[in-house]
Amino acid sequence: MRGVSCLQVLLLLVLGAAGTQGRKSAACGQPRMSSRIVGGRDGRDGEWPWQASIQHRGAHVCGGSLIAPQWVLTAAHCFPRRALPAEYRVRLGALRLGSTSPRTLSVPVRRVLLPPDYSEDGARGDLALLQLRRPVPLSARVQPVCLPVPGARPPPGTPCRVTGWGSLRPGVPLPEWRPLQGVRVPLLDSRTCDGLYHVGADVPQAERIVLPGSLCAGYPQGHKDACQGDSGGPLTCLQSGSWVLVGVVSWGKGCALPNRPGVYTSVATYSPWIQARVSF
């Protein structure tokens, strides 16, 4: 489902049961429709209310996540160097991109902020903060996801969800009538993931392919993954009853290939940078 190489509320810090506290409000990370996605299945209305579609001149280019009423987090590589914020809009509250509804929102982007360590090859700092032209009203279909505490990361094996409107497989785009897709993927140890990417690659073992600031999720045998069009979208994990934005879809080799799990930008690594700029 990966792109080409995806009102005011008071948010409080609360302690999580396992020490994975995050920036939360009464609404963040708690959809009114409970998730039933186990692997590669259709989403339901209001199931992932933070899911955003980043659109360039009306066309979907990447996914994103609402983290505050006026802020969306996505991937930096979704924005070419000379891209103008005024050419982009963020669509929220949608289940299918091919249909319109008065319950969905389409908001212009005011500005795009990139981390200071972002590299254009996407290897580092592949995040973009989008400030919307105006705050959006929150509802059952539009809610923010929770942010992780700086440096906190769930352990390997934690089951998480990646969602998006990206391709079903390489070269097979999601039909416009199909709803938002989601798949369950476990977090992988970073060294294990880096080792998998060295399999069949002409890269010395001592040279890191998956760099610090990234994390991996998926299966060594493949089968389940993000794909073209999902870049910038959310990798969320359920922690203490709330969904937390653990990763942002960044890059991978193909889609769901063996030894090539999805690579995500670690949101916890950049939480201080995010929180210093976002008005919650």
UniProtKB/Swiss-Prot annotation:
Q: What Gene Ontology molecular function terms does this protein carry?
A: serine-type endopeptidase activity
Peptidase S1 domain location, by residue?
Answer: 37-279
Active site residues according to the UniProt entry: 77, 126, 231
Q: Using the record, list the residue span of the signal peptide; answer none if the entry has no such feature.
A: 1-22
* Enzyme Commission number: 3.4.21.-
Induction (UniProt): Up-regulated by phorbol myristate acetate (PMA).
Question: Main localisation, per the record?
Answer: secreted
Q: Which GO terms describe its cellular component?
A: cytoplasm; extracellular space
EC top class, in one word?
hydrolase
Tissue note: Predominantly expressed in macrophages. Present in the spleen, small and large intestine, lung and brain (at protein level). Highly expressed in peripheral leukocytes, ovary, retina, spleen and stomach. Moderately expressed in thymus, uterus and platelets, as well as some brain tissues, such as thalamus and fetal brain.
The UniProt entry's GO biological process terms, in alphabetical order, are: proteolysis
Q: Which UniProt keywords apply?
A: Disulfide bond, Hydrolase, Protease, Secreted, Serine protease, Signal
Q: Does the keyword Disulfide bond apply?
A: yes
Disulfide bonding pattern of the chain: 62-78, 160-237, 193-216, 227-255
Keyword Secreted present in the record's keywords: the answer is yes
InterPro entries from the UniProt entry: Peptidase_S1_PA, Peptidase_S1_PA_chymotrypsin, Peptidase_S1A, Trypsin_dom, TRYPSIN_HIS, TRYPSIN_SER
Q: Where in the cell is it found?
A: Secreted
Q: Which family does it belong to?
A: Belongs to the peptidase S1 family.
User: What is this protein for, i.e. what is its function?
Assistant: Serine protease that has amidolytic activity, cleaving its substrates before Arg residues.
Protein name (Swiss-Prot/TrEMBL): Serine protease 33
Which species does this protein come from? Homo sapiens (Human)
Gene name, per UniProt, is: PRSS33
